[in-house]
Amino acid sequence: MLGCVASAAAAFTSPGESILLHSPTYIGFTGVLENCGRNIVLSDLVQDENGVWRMDYADMDRKLKEHNIHFAIFCSPHNPTGRVWEREEIEKAMEIYKANECVVISDEIWSDLTLPGFKHIPTQSVSKDARERTIALYAPSKTFNLAGLVGSYHIIYNRMLRDRVEKASSLSHYNSPNVLSVHALIGAYRPEGYQWVDELREVLKSNADYAYNYILEHFKGVKLSKPEGTYMLYLDCEEWCKEHDTDMDTPVSYTHLRAHETGRNL
């Protein structure tokens, strides 16, 4: 998947140009784009009165205009907050991207792992324009634990976008598939895989509920919201760190709370 991100960035931007991402963000994006010489501009997600993470549409529009950005990465479901964006939210985001003439990468690698009660809406499905300006990325790696096989795929309806991405991809051969990953993908997407994912989603919901309640009960000062998708919990430890006279740059071990990576890169 990151290979396609790099190829698309090479196809539609030049070194030194800016790309818009939401913050917090998947560190794989930032690493790849920085290595490609692109400037990263972040639009912070904000929490509403119920602690639900939301996009700041005004901030997105302002930063796209200020930095003359025409290439953006949209993560749906969102990594690492676990938000499963609603159709209206995606429509508003795509309207802003359209107004600023952006090519959009929609990372939908977590699309199979929505928790019960939530439904993934493909970005390309919300409008005709979204279908034509979006490069959608998918993979079985998160859902079926196949990341080590390095197999993903993209859906690009717009022929011009597709031709340019495929040309950029062909230069490095980084995106060439291998036989093992192809057959693993085929096997995962068979009916047996559907049944397994349905069972997995129930287990993840139970685990998320347990972890959420346990952390709130045992770690005063740690803030979190229940995820709607993915298998991650995004924690705000700022108050906890103040109470324990530490900071996010210091590895900590406190009863069962152990932090080997600070999360600052997100």
Regions inferred by a protein language model and the residue ranges of each:
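Single conserved hydrophobic/aromatic residue that forms the stacking wall/gate
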Residues: 256-259, 263-266
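Conserved Walker B
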Residues: 108-110
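A short helix->loop->beta-strand "cap" motif at the edges of active sites that frequently abuts
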Residues: 38, 99-102, 131-132
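Conserved core of the PLP fold type I
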Residues: 1-95, 112-113, 120-125
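Short acidic capping loops at alpha-helix termini that bridge into adjacent secondary structure
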Residues: 16-18, 131-134
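Hydrophobic "anchor" residues on beta-strands that sit immediately upstream
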Residues: 71, 103-104, 135
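PLP-dependent aminotransferase class I/II
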Residues: 133-217, 222-229
